[in-house]
Amino acid sequence: MGEILLLAAGGALGAVSRYGLNNLTVKLLGDSFPYGTLIVNCLGCFVLGFLMQWGFSSDSHNTHLKLMLTAGFLGAFTTFSTFSYETLDCFKNGDYFNGFSNILANVLLGLLMVFIGAYLGSLLKQNSGT
């Protein structure tokens, strides 16, 4: 039961964080392109790559924290369904450039951010001697 509560707490924090960051992004950059979804997905990819290399790469002694941060927080913070819906919406409105740009940006930048996060996590882990 404790794991479910940790998962729910992480998920609640992730969802609220995504909502807040998306609203801030719309205020700052407008809504002509789904920047909010792109930013949360890239940030989530970076954090997951970092955490999996730095703190959770092997048999972590803190599986509860891993569950709360990865499946809970990052699972709710990032969003494949919103990305897919926003892309389809672009296509339905005839905005093929933004639709394809959204696909390329989320996939390529997501992969790049996981790589960068994992690389930095690995460097930090090596430098800390753990």
From Swiss-Prot:
Annotated positions binding Na(+): G75, T78
Domain of life of the organism encoding this protein: Bacteria
UniProt keywords, alphabetically: Cell membrane, Ion channel, Ion transport, Membrane, Metal-binding, Sodium, Transmembrane, Transmembrane helix, Transport
Subcellular location: Cell membrane
Regions that span the bilayer: 1-21, 36-56, 65-85, 103-123
Homology family: Belongs to the fluoride channel Fluc/FEX (TC 1.A.43) family.
Known function: Fluoride-specific ion channel. Important for reducing fluoride concentration in the cell, thus reducing its toxicity.
Name this protein carries in UniProt: Fluoride-specific ion channel FluC
Protein's organism: Dehalococcoides mccartyi (strain ATCC BAA-2100 / JCM 16839 / KCTC 5957 / BAV1)
Gene: fluC
